[in-house]
Amino acid sequence: MHWTSILSAILLFCLSGARASPAKTVIRNKVPLLVTNACTRIFQKVTWEYTSKSKRSSPVCSYEPAFQSMLYCIYETLDEKGYSNKTLEKTFSTIKKNCASYSDALQNMTNSEFYDVLNNGTRHMTPYVKGSANLTYPVEMDTQLRKAYYHALHGFYANLDVGNIYGGIICAYFVAIMAFAGVLHCMNYTPFKTVLLKQKLVGYVRGYLTLPTIGSKHASDFSYFRIFTGYLPTRLEGIIILGYLVLHTVFLAYGYEYDPENIIFKSRRVQVARYVADRSGVLAFAHFPLIVLFAGRNNFLEYISGVKYTSFIMFHKWLGRMMFLDAMIHGSAYTSYTVANKTWATSKNRLYWQFGVAALCLAGTMVFFSFAVFRKYFYEAFLFLHIVLGAMFFYACWEHVVSLSGIEWIYTAIAIWIVDRIIRIIKASYFGFPKASLQLIGDDLIRLTVKKPARPWRAKPGQYVFVSFLHPLYFWQSHPFTVLDSVSKNGELVIILKEKKGVTRLVKKYVCRNGGKTSMRLAIEGPYGSSSPVNNYNNVLLLTGGTGLPGPIAHAIKLGKTSAAAGKQSVKLVIAVRGFDVLEAYKPELMCLENLNVQLHIYNTMEVPSLTPSDSLDISQQDEKADEKGTVVATTLEKSANPLGFDGVVFHCGRPNVKELLHEAAELSGSLSVVCCGPPIFVDKVRNETAKIVLDKSAKAIEYFEEYQCW
């Protein structure tokens, strides 16, 4: 078990012992509770001929005339509103709960005894005269006053309840979207998907709204002054996020029922501050389950919808930002409330207040260190801080509401976290902890091969696993890698590692110290992610480069073995690489394609072909040309050397012309699926060019599958 799981388990243990019995969230705006509390408040303010030695006392619970007056107030209010005796009897239970801390005498009272008290009080009931003091008899309150108290409490309680309802709707919004995505995902495995893609309206929607990036960036980050960096959603993700933001804004700003007479609160300002504080606080906590679910590896919505983990991380970020905004509004509004109510001096010393301040500070720190610049350059530090601060934030939030309400949102988030960790442990244990062979290839690549477990275990093309290298210096780290089935030895997995910062650099140093070839014990957890369903398309174009080769190569091998029988007209794999070291790492898999029904084109971007005057004049025979940004691209006439040693591959120098490749594929008869995984700029280029092709050929079934993942 990784150190993060251990830390979180300790946190859960602390939470379980934090308080003996956390306060449950109840629906407050129910008639029995509402009318009982309204009448209780009325008669708490009356001066009775009542004294008590106990500091905790209430005349409506302990002094019979006050108790009779409250019962009659409840009866009259319910009678005016047309409620039956059944509702009246529910108020008896509410009275018992309210008075449990003040009087034991009421706890064993039967409904008949409550009616006897009510009838006895009714016979002696006297209209209340304002200013009366030391009352020894039951009194009847003015109807307008009763209605005013009822309305005031109704607005206050409704605001608390509706916050939870709105939070539930936000959760349901994302679940509904993922359910709809799941329906579309299931259609990928039926002929209906290609029929749907041929509809012109669908093509226009996809070409303008769902496929393209916002601007020209999604996988690649935007940057201002090298400090303000980040990642933009796709247009579809942007639409979903916009819908969420609209919902959230409406839920935060709409539906308040203010009391014009300010019966409960001292002024309109105090009332508004309290209502906004309560609403924003409840909405903040409603984000807990989704934030934990979307960050988890075993997200059931990912399995249902087929939506990539990258998209869920995008939603996770926006949910986190809005949760922090809600918390800021909650803290500011509640501070304003206590200042205006002149209770700040005492409130700030309360435990819930102090933990609320701590939670807000922790949330702000988490948001700050989640900026893309920290994730990009200091990922391990970011991950460590995110987990530690997240655990502390959970604890602070628990303590903040443990005696109030809202704990159920934390319960749900903890349950999601526990299920995720249990599944992760099961997956890692199922694979076992085998020894893997590691071989250094070139300067920065490592080919890792490991035996599969004896029991059934299968990873589809494009799926990935999380690997922990069980070395004393970095066993606690877990990193994702796309996996391939070995073509040279049955029952083996292949993972290609490229040296970067962090654990891959340490692993490379370890391999180098052992002569470039060694073994190491691993923990493998997976597989995760979904495989792009390309089998139902007549033509498949696989575009890849950089470290994104495993998925498309695995697709090519699988399609090459089945394409003839499945009626595939064309399977084309286009690989862009900087030098041939990466080809050496994948040589067994690429050599396997020689005898398969796959067109393999490899572009060496380190070699730039030379232009001749005749090339530039004759467009039909030119070897390469510059795209709109001046990037040199190559065509089939300018060849590079063939390091693989077989004739089933066409080598080019320069960069692939994405637009041209897509147009060529789109001209083929039948449906087309485009699969892309590679460097961020390359992925964004393919996505946007595919969107243009979909618009140009809106009556043709063209689908785009992106296997690029951002962690």
Curated annotation (Swiss-Prot):
The chain crosses the membrane at residues 165-185, 236-256, 281-301, 318-340, 354-374, 378-398, 401-423. Belongs to the ferric reductase (FRE) family. It catalyses: 2 a Fe(II)-siderophore + NADP(+) + H(+) = 2 a Fe(III)-siderophore + NADPH. GO terms for biological process: copper ion import; intracellular iron ion homeostasis; iron ion transport; nuclear-transcribed mRNA catabolic process, nonsense-mediated decay. Heme 1 binds at residues 316, 386. Residues 186-235, 302-317, 375-377, 424-711 are cytoplasmic. The keyword Zinc-finger does not apply. It is a multi-pass membrane protein. SUPFAM superfamilies: Ferredoxin reductase-like, C-terminal NADP-linked domain (SSF52343), Riboflavin synthase domain-like (SSF63380). This is Ferric/cupric reductase transmembrane component 2. Metalloreductase responsible for reducing extracellular iron and copper prior to import. Catalyzes the reductive uptake of Fe(3+)-salts and Fe(3+) bound to catecholate or hydroxamate siderophores. Fe(3+) is reduced to Fe(2+), which then dissociates from the siderophore and can be imported by the high-affinity Fe(2+) transport complex in the plasma membrane. Also participates in Cu(2+) reduction and Cu(+) uptake. Pfam families: FAD_binding_8, Ferric_reduct, NAD_binding_6. Residues 415-534 form the FAD-binding FR-type domain. It is found in: Cell membrane. Induction: By transcription factors AFT1 and AFT2 upon iron deprivation. GO terms for cellular component: fungal-type vacuole; plasma membrane. FAD binds at residues 479-485. InterPro entries: FAD-bd_8, FAD-bd_FR_type, Fe3_Rdtase_TM_dom, Fe_red_NAD-bd_6, Ferric/Cupric_Reductase, FNR_nucleotide-bd, Riboflavin_synthase-like_b-brl. Its cofactor is FAD; heme. The lineage of its organism: Eukaryota, Fungi, Dikarya, Ascomycota, Saccharomycotina. Its EC number is 1.16.1.9. Heme 2 binds at residues 330, 400.
